[in-house]
Amino acid sequence: MEIQRTANAGVLLKMDGVSILLDGLCDPVGEYLPTTADIAKQLLDNPPDALAFTHYHADHCSEALLLPYRKKNLRPIYGPESLPLGTVKIGEVTITPVESRHLGKTEPNLQHVSYILQGTKCVWFVGDAAPQQWKNRTDLPKPDVLIAPYAYANTLSTWNMVGSLTKQVVLVHLPPRETDQYGLWNAVEKTTEDRGNLSLWIPQMGEILSI
């Protein structure tokens, strides 16, 4: 399985011969990195089999970068509105949307879904979902790999909860160190000093992980 970071909080996931772009096209927002022109071209030259978005904030979904797919590609585009309940199968990979609550309390009515992708491995892509809501979700399959924002690793209580879910974490939604005005990197590094048997990756933009 390959995971390439293509956006602030998004990745291109390749598993079992299927490629799925998850929140993988974004605009510049504050200190967070946008999808670069080179990555946008790479994705258009080799389009993924599907695109999925957890919500439509600009740091997770770029309307401008999404437009060429809607104009030129016949592949289905999946997002919160088109996947409210059911599971979709693409090749040997199933994608199950799970209704989830966005971090914080500023937008209580914001539509947000997370995705469970199952093939030879089970991957959770949670978007900006608040972490504590997963604590007692015994109805969901446990992930082999969790792809999550920095908020899943900036407090010990949350990090311990993550450790009860999975042993492999890919952390996204972190700004570059040089523009990190809120100390997010310091909080994450302090929290994750003792990783136990947890494997943690924090990929750079464009970096490809083989897991």
Across the structure, where does each feature detected by a protein language model lie?
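Active-site-proximal loop/helix segments of hydrolase catalytic cores
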Residues: 104-164
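Binuclear metal-ion centers of metallo-dependent hydrolases, dominated by the metallo-beta-lactamase
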Residues: 4, 82-91, 109, 160-211
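Short, conserved loop/helix-junction motifs that constitute active-site signature segments
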Residues: 43-46, 67-73, 138-142, 160-166
